[in-house]
Amino acid sequence: MTTLTARPEAITFDPQQTALIVVDMQNAYATPGGYLDLAGFDVSTTRPVIANIQTAVTAARAAGMLIIWFQNGWDEQYVEAGGPGSPNFHKSNALKTMRKQPQLQGKLLAKGSWDYQLVDELVPQPGDIVLPKPRYSGFFNTPLDSILRSRGIRHLVFTGIATNVCVESTLRDGFFLEYFGVVLEDATHQAGPEFAQKAALFNIETFFGWVSDVETFCDALSSTSFARIA
């Protein structure tokens, strides 16, 4: 068992029953010229987040934790995004940006596109699981819950972008499904102003989970090495 110093209190977990979740570390969300950047969101401070996720993934993999990578997006025709009858059609900033700038149609969050791809620095390895998701929450219309339950996983450690959208949405849904969620705050980044990051972390540590950081996470895992049993 590993005890992780966190807010509002420490949390103890078995790395063999824990997954590291990497949320949407795609060019769309972390790279200049990607969807968030084109939609007017600041992505200039995402590089340290990428480096911190690399560190967290390395430590988690060495401890035998399952690594799950999410990619948010839809088919090239955007059928999966939903039409005017879906609130996603009206609220997705990617879809709204493409309607405002028709030359971007088919380029934002479309499967197979550069925008959809994970950033170059973050490469899934054999044994990792890569899951597409069509909405903010990684539990909606994906096999995530089945994958976790079949492996006896109850604790989820979250990294990725955006803290206040897909990270928080997935952690909240996990809370409702009886998963224990931890966010590594310096391995996440908000979509929007800095107060959005602070508000999301406040919500998580107060109502839905725990908040820690990458150095503390790595230190907690470093005392013992683990080997995942297939």
Swiss-Prot record:
CDD domains to which the protein is assigned, alphabetical: cysteine_hydrolases
Keywords tagged on the record: Hydrolase
Organism: Escherichia coli O81 (strain ED1a)
Hydrolase among keywords: yes
PANTHER family tied to this protein: ISOCHORISMATASE-LIKE DOMAIN-CONTAINING PROTEIN, PEROXYUREIDOACRYLATE/UREIDOACRYLATE AMIDOHYDROLASE-RELATED
Coiled coil regions in record: none
Known EC number: 3.5.1.110
Record bears the keyword Magnesium: no
Reaction(s) this enzyme catalyzes, per UniProt: (Z)-3-ureidoacrylate + H2O + H(+) = (Z)-3-aminoacrylate + NH4(+) + CO2; (Z)-3-ureidoacrylate + H2O = (Z)-3-aminoacrylate + carbamate + H(+); (Z)-2-methylureidoacrylate + H2O + H(+) = (Z)-2-methylaminoacrylate + NH4(+) + CO2
Task of the protein: Hydrolyzes ureidoacrylate to form aminoacrylate and carbamate. The carbamate hydrolyzes spontaneously, thereby releasing one of the nitrogen atoms of the pyrimidine ring as ammonia and one of its carbon atoms as CO2.
Molecular function GO labels: hydrolase activity, acting on carbon-nitrogen (but not peptide) bonds, in linear amides
Domain of life, per lineage: Bacteria
Name of the protein described by the UniProt record: Ureidoacrylate amidohydrolase RutB
Pfam families documented for this protein: Isochorismatase (PF00857)
Entry annotation: catalytic residues: 24, 133, 166
Record's note on what induces expression: Up-regulated by the nitrogen regulatory protein C (NtrC also called GlnG) and repressed by RutR.
Family membership: Belongs to the isochorismatase family. RutB subfamily.
GO terms classed as biological process: nitrogen utilization; uracil catabolic process
